[in-house]
Each structure stands twice: as structure tokens, then as C-alpha cells.
Regions:
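Extended acidic/charged loop-beta regions that coordinate divalent cations
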Residues: 65, 116-133, 229, 238, ...
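Transmembrane-cytosolic junction motif
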Residues: 154-184
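Walker A (P-loop) phosphate-binding motif
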Residues: 175-222
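Short, well-ordered alpha-helix to beta-strand connector turns
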Residues: 185-186, 211-212, 237, 261, ...
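Short catalytic-loop micro-motif centered on adjacent basic/acidic residues
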Residues: 190, 215-217, 239-243, 298-299, ...
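Acidic, Mg2+-coordinating active-site environments of NTP-dependent enzymes
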Residues: 266-400, 425, 450-458, 467-485
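ATP-dependent carboxylate-amine ligase
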Residues: 1-163, 365-375, 379-517
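Flexible active-site lid/hinge loop adjacent to a nucleotide/diphosphate
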Residues: 223, 234-307, 350, 422, ...
Length: 517
């Protein structure tokens, strides 16, 4: 009977572990497999707290029942109760919906199986030793219960142990990608910046298609492995456009070494990822590394971008290679005059906002220097489609929705509010605030609140604690407190849209936090 109970305990314990570690695996994946992602993730902390609270509650009951008769039977009853509690947790975890669900990639499967093996060893060894020592079943069940306190830590340890192998494995993919790049030998263009990378990449790809067969990295796959995946699709392409992402010092240098681009675009620099860069000076230094190319260098003419020889600047200043001296934005799009080289074009686009016009001009400058005619560039700009979630105008009945949920920086937020200002009717802003701004996060969100107060008629805030600086900024800016609505989740806010929105309203959805916030 004791051995049958122990066997059942091992099976049920391992199955329970396999299901209940999902939040920790998810937090790890969302943080780029940084072990700290398990513990820092704000949406997965409740899982750790719930498990710990459940274990402590049952341990207290277990200790109290030690003094009753037939405690072995009571132990089995308590174990059954605990099993039902875990079953409830499993169902709860399975039902939870996420914007980016946990993906069981090859790496995740390896980590998952490794963590299960470690837990099975801990549980099996402990139960085996206790059985061999004649420890009664009551305490064996208690030991199995206490092992649940190790769930998150086992995932963390598994990740640390697996890291050297994963680095070697990643290096293999990167090396294969580098070799394929050498073999295919396309024109390689690198694009980086604190904002606008994906937009400029997509706009440039559309312009270059008039002359070249183009492959660009997908979505925001801007890490070495993302590059490797994209390079795997190279098939007699003339041009490869690589979007470079950077969260810390050294990231751009690593990608430059991998891709060895011929040409580069620097879209702009602002205070972003300061939690991992630690200072704006580090951001500036790292982003400028993309301009270490022998070919065409294009950069936005902004305060944080240095004036360097051989760089073609894009902006609104005299002396810029590509200059915009008039921008008119409306609900139907943007009109602007573009001076490039010694030519002038009067252009119209369906894209909204000054920042999108600047992104078009950055792409146009590179395309022009790579042999795309001004007529083709004009045609591409006229027919350019908005990129999803980047100030995309969506009509929902009589309500205009400006979807800018992929915007997460102060400059982009200001541009989006300037676009909102151009719309007629009541103006509403929905936001959870901005993240990854380091020590400046509170002050920047406070300023965002003041800027919203100057434009909007109603504010919908997601998360009371996180948006407190925005709330304070709104009040400081003279905003009507009765027009501020706070919800803990975006889903709850959406369920109240029928009461919050009316015909003729324009709703700006500014930023959307990832699942680990």
C-alpha cells in the first residue's frame, strides 16, 4: 500500500508540476529567457503567491492533524483535497488568455523536459529515501506537498544550467545564417533606432520592390535568432533589410558583426530601454554603431543624433539632404512637400502623423540613393498602407479608433496626440502608460498625463498603480476628474466601451503592455 501510494504520488506530482509551471515558463520566454523574468514579471507574481499560500495553508492543517488518530488516512484525505486544489489551479492556468501565448519552441520544449526531470529527481529521491527509512506515509505526503514551493526555482535553475548549451546552439544557427549571407551576397541594409524601425523597414521594402527582389526581417524579429530565421528564407534576393533591436550595450555591435551591412538607417533616439541601458548616453552610443558602414548612411536630423561626415540627414532643417517644409495632417492622411537632392515633390499619403512622414522620407532617401526613381518613390508613398498597430486608423461604426498600441516611447506618444488633435468630435485616450524608461518612467508618464490633458476630453487608464503618475499629470493639467476612468485590465475597459464611447468620438489606444506587465 505504501509503495502504491508513493508511486501515485510521483505520477501526480510530476503531472501537477508540468501544468503549474506554465506561468513561470511564459514569464521566462517573454523576458528573452532572462532568469529574472520569472520573478520580476508582474502578471506571474500572483502564481507564486497563490502556490505559496496554498502550500502554507495545507502545511498548517497537516501539522494540526498530526495529533489525531488514523493520521495516515487523514493524510490521504488531505492529499486528495490538495490534489483538487491543484486541479483548480491547472484549469485556471489553461483558461487564461494572453496577447502572446506561451510558444513551445524547440528551446522551450528542452527547458520544459529538463525542468520536469529535475523535479522528478527531487521528488523521487526524497520519497525513495523516506520509504527506505521507514518514514510513515503521512510525512511522505507532507514532503511532496512542500516540493511545490520549489516550482519557480526549479524553472530558474533549469534555465541557468541549460544556458551554456543554448548559447552554443544559437551560435550554430547564427553561423549558418552568416554563411548563407556570404553565399547569397544580397545588398544588406541595417535599420535601427528607438522608434520607427519597423515602419521604415516596411516602407523601404515597398519602395525597393520597383527595382529589386527584397527580403526583410518579419514583424519585429530584430534579434540574432530573428535574423537567422529571416536569412533562412533568402532565395536569390537582391536586397536584405534587417531591423536591428537593442536592449543593452553590445546588442547593435553583435548584429553588425553578424550581418555586416552595406548601408544603414538611424531612425531616431529617445529615452527607451533605460532599465537595461542604464543611461541615455549608453543608448546614443549604441545606436550610432549602426552607421559604421562603408556605404550609404541615412539618419534623422534630431537632437540626439550626432552630426557626422558622410551621413545623409532627413528632417525639417536647411541643409538636410531630404527636407520636409510643410506637413498637413487630417483624418484622411497627410500632405507634405519633400525636397530631396535638388528635386521637390508635393506628396499625399494615407499615413497619419508627422513621424510617419519622417519615416517615409528616411526610406525614400535610401531608396533614391539605391536607384529608385522619384516617380516610383512618389507612387509608393501614395499607395503605402498603414502598418497594423502603428497609428492605424480603424473605423468601428461611428467611432474612429487610432490603434497605436505598438507605441511605447515619449516622442511617439506626443506625435500620436498631435494626430488626435486634428480629429473632430470628442477625443478619448486609452493608455496603460509607458514602460522601460528606467528612473525617468514616473516623470515621463506624468508629462504624458499633462499632454493628454491638453488634447483629450476623456481619459481611460489601465492599471491604477501603474498609471498613477498619468493621473497626477492629468489633474495637474486641469483635466476634469470625472472624465478619468480607471480599469485594471484592457479587457474590462473594452467591456465598457458601449458606455464610454459615442458616435463621432475618436479613441486613441496608446501603447499596450506585454503580458509580463
Amino acid at each position: 500500500m505504501r509503495y502504491l501510494t508513493a508511486s501515485l504520488l510521483l505520477v501526480l506530482g510530476v503531472v501537477s508540476f508540468a501544468f503549474l509551471i506554465k506561468p513561470y515558463l511564459h514569464g521566462l520566454q517573454l523576458s528573452g529567457y532572462k532568469t529574472s523574468g520569472i520573478y520580476k514579471s508582474k502578471k506571474f507574481k500572483p502564481s507564486i503567491c497563490f502556490q505559496t499560500g496554498t502550500v502554507i495553508s495545507f502545511v498548517i492543517v497537516w501539522v494540526l492533524f498530526y495529533f489525531v488518530l488514523n493520521r495516515e488516512i487523514w493524510g490521504l484525505i488531505l492529499a486528495l483535497g490538495y490534489l483538487l486544489t491543484n486541479l483548480f489551479s491547472v484549469v485556471k492556468v489553461a483558461k487564461k488568455k494572453y496577447k502572446k501565448p506561451l510558444k513551445f519552441t524547440k528551446r522551450m520544449i528542452r527547458l520544459f523536459l529538463f525542468a520536469i526531470a529535475i523535479y522528478a529527481a527531487i521528488l523521487g529521491l526524497g520519497v525513495g529515501l523516506m520509504l527506505g527509512s521507514g518514514v510513515e506515509t503521512y510525512f511522505i505526503l507532507l514532503y511532496a506537498l512542500l516540493t511545490e514551493l520549489t516550482y519557480a526555482h526549479i524553472v530558474a535553475v533549469s534555465n541557468v544550467i541549460a544556458l551554456p548549451f543554448e548559447k552554443l546552439n544559437n551560435r550554430r544557427y547564427v553561423l549558418a545564417a552568416k554563411n548563407k549571407l556570404i553565399k547569397e551576397n544580397p545588398i544588406k541594409i541595417a535599420i535601427t533606432g528607438s522608434y520607427g524601425k519597423t515602419s521604415v523597414k516596411n516602407y523601404l521594402a515597398e519602395m525597393l520592390k520597383y527595382k529589386y527582389k527584397v527580403l526583410a526581417t518579419k514583424a519585429s524579429f530584430n534579434t540574432p535568432l530573428g535574423m537567422a530565421m529571416a536569412i533562412g528564407e533568402l532565395d536569390c534576393h537582391d536586397v536584405f533589410i534587417a531591423e536591428f533591436g537593442a536592449r543593452k550595450t553590445g546588442d547593435i555591435a553583435e548584429l553588425m558583426n553578424m550581418i555586416k551591412p552595406d548601408h544603414a538607417i538611424l531612425t531616431g533616439i529617445t529615452a527607451q530601454h533605460l532599465e537595461t541601458f542604464y543611461s541615455i548616453e549608453n543608448v546614443i552610443e549604441e545606436k550610432h554603431k549602426v552607421l559604421n558602414v562603408d556605404g550609404i548612411k541615412v539618419a534623422a536630423d534630431t537632437d540626439m543624433i550626432r552630426k557626422l561626415d558622410g551621413v545623409l540627414y532627413v528632417g525639417k532643417n536647411d541643409g538636410d539632404f531630404c527636407k520636409c517644409d510643410l506637413i498637413e495632417s487630417s483624418e484622411s492622411g497627410s500632405r507634405f512637400i519633400m525636397h530631396i537632392d535638388e528635386s521637390t515633390l508635393v506628396l499625399k499619403t494615407a499615413l497619419l502623423g508627422e513621424h510617419n512622414v519622417m519615416n517615409l522620407m528616411l526610406a525614400a532617401t535610401m531608396a533614391y540613393k539605391l536607384g529608385i526613381s522619384l516617380g516610383e518613390i512618389e507612387d509608393a508613398i501614395i499607395n503605402m498602407k498603414p502598418i497594423p498597430h502603428r497609428l492605424e486608423l480603424i473605423k468601428s461604426g461611428n467611432v474612429n479608433i487610432l490603434d497605436d498600441t505598438f507605441n511605447c516611447n515619449p516622442q511617439g506618444a506626443e506625435c500620436a496626440l498631435n494626430v488626435l488633435k486634428e480629429f473632430d468630435g470628442r477625443k478619448i485616450v486609452l493608455t496603460p502608460g509607458m514602460i522601460e524608461l528606467g528612473d525617468a518612467e514616473k516623470s515621463e508618464n506624468y508629462l504624458l498625463g499633462r499632454k493628454i490633458a491638453a488634447v483629450a476630453d476623456r481619459a481611460i487608464l489601465i492599471g491604477a498603480n501603474r498609471t498613477k503618475p498619468i493621473y497626477e499629470g492629468l489633474i495637474s493639467g486641469g483635466f476634469n476628474e470625472r472624465e478619468i476612468f480607471i480599469f485594471e485590465t484592457l479587457e474590462k475597459a473594452k467591456s465598457n466601451f458601449s458606455a464610454l464611447l459615442g458616435g463621432g468620438d475618436t479613441l486613441l489606444m496608446l501603447n499596450d503592455l506585454p503580458d509580463n506587465y
